[in-house]
Amino acid sequence: MSRDTKTETADEYQVVVIGGGAAGLSAAVTLGRALRSVLVIDAGEPRNAPAAGVHGFLSRDGIDPRELLDMGREEARGYGVDFIAGVAVAARSTAGAEEGAELSFDVELADGRTVKARRILVTTGLTDVLPDIDGIRERWGRDVLHCPYCHGWEVRNKAIGILGSVPMALHQTMLFRQWSPNITLFLNDVVEPTDAEWEQLAARSISVVEGKVESLAIQDDALRGVVLASGTVIPLEAVVTATRLEARSAVLESLGVPVVEHPMGVGHHVEVNPMGGATAVPGVWAAGNVADLMGQVMASAASGVMAGAAINAHLVAEETRLAVDVARLSSLAR
């Protein structure tokens, strides 16, 4: 494969992508097809690993999450992309202080290795911070769910309980009512509906249970219901809960990229330019759930493509500027 090799050594790449999910792999394919030298550092911890399938992904609906990533890695390798299995813990700028200096970075891995990059794309995703209720973590991604567009079809017409872990539970309740007429909202000593919301719940024939949820009732490796603090068991086939969404932002923070509270109050994320994912730090991009907490897999993949194209354009601009500088010096030397 023909490729500009001016900056390529065993540990130096034009672009280092940190995170090997849908966003990172899509960016890697885009950059590989642009003849860029690309390294993907992947910790192997996809957010959707507990789920049986990926949904809402055109032509791949229901595919196992790991199979989708395997396919993405194979495609990226076909364009010369390299991979490291490991965890990036920090990065720092190594560019000179003089005006017009080329951007460059060192990326540090947990095992002590360091790789060099001209540009960095962070696609490390987010962590779902689950409510502290017995059974939630064990059933997460199976019959404890959060997104109707990811899981609603699979639990259609079933007995679904909405756990009042955050005020947004009312919004989730109304959404999931589209998939099932058998919806129960558990206020859980957290949610306090307004008069208008009580009216909406009644109009949609949604049951409301007061009191704190103590645990999930699980039998034969299946959810059977929720257990209230009073000991009452409410039979259910699925539980919906909102999570706090926390961007995996350690590398970005080490570079000085600010991490801020999401406008909807659902967690922390990184603000980026919507036209390509550039962060506030020159030479550093972010894509996928680390920037878009609400994005589904296909949206994350799309943001990776956009970021890859933006990074390539940024490199082209720098290379053109440097070529002009060389040409000017050459003409002066004649």
Give the location of each predicted region:
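Beta1-alpha1 glycine-rich phosphate/pyrophosphate-binding loop at the start
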Residues: 13-67, 159, 164, 168-191
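Short amphipathic alpha-helical segments
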Residues: 28-30, 52, 132-135, 173-175, ...
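FAD-binding core/adjacent interface of flavoenzyme oxidoreductases
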Residues: 2-16, 83-158, 238, 266-275
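FAD-site-proximal beta/loop scaffold in flavoenzymes
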Residues: 3-4, 138-154, 245-298
